[in-house]
Amino acid sequence: PELETEQSILDTIRQKDRFIHVPYHSFNSFIRVLREAALSADVKAINVTLYRLAKASKVVKALICAARNGKKVTVVIELLARFDEESNIKWSKRLQEAGVEVVFGVEGLKIHSKLVYIQCKSGDIACIGTGNLHEGNAKVYTDYMMMTARPQIVREVKKVFEFISKPFKPVKFRELLVSPNEMKPKILRLISDEIRNAKEGLEAWIKVKINHITDEDVVAKLYEASQAGVKISLLIRGNCS
């Protein structure tokens, strides 16, 4: 409710991190971020990753508005989003016609992240989400989004976009877990930490909320943790093997 009533949602995010949990919180808070960024003279550029979009996407409309208002707008759109390939091609053409720079990801990788980087004169802002920037999905799927102005996080979100545009350039991350190179090793280390805690008689537990879990090494490590006495709770929407 606080985000819905604030005069400037960008200034509100600069004051402290904001967290929305759809569908229990309104996805409109995020739409407001894009709309304000599109109109604000303080905003210089907007970078967004897109995977699935609503049929009458307010996200796309806000990005087109931003481009027409002179912002440098860059959209990374995944053409291999299952069942949405044709739709994403259509959106790509519409964005390009409006003056948006459209990037089609990195060869050999699928861009599945949901990220926004907003470059501002008075302090950059980033949004990191688990769900598609899709108004329809946000009404039925439970997802999270963090909106922050913390420099150490915003810088790394910016680095993700730099990697996508120049994948030959080595990039290291300290705050974000970025697959395919860093996420799995970190998850395995975290599970190992809980195994060690359990063996030392300390409190040890793992809670996972995820769409699918099919990585054999991670599944095997969870079995190992369970056998070691780690309390494990898994909430999995789709495949579990």
Identify the residue ranges that each predicted region occupies.
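N-terminal localization/anchoring segments of enzymes in phospholipid and broader phosphate metabolism
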Residues: 1-206, 224-228, 238-241
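Histidine- and/or cysteine-centered catalytic micro-motif in compact active-site loops
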Residues: 211-213, 237-239
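Hydrophobic alpha/beta core scaffold segments
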Residues: 231-235
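Flexible, glycine/threonine-enriched loop-and-boundary segments that flank and lead into catalytic domains
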Residues: 99, 213-222
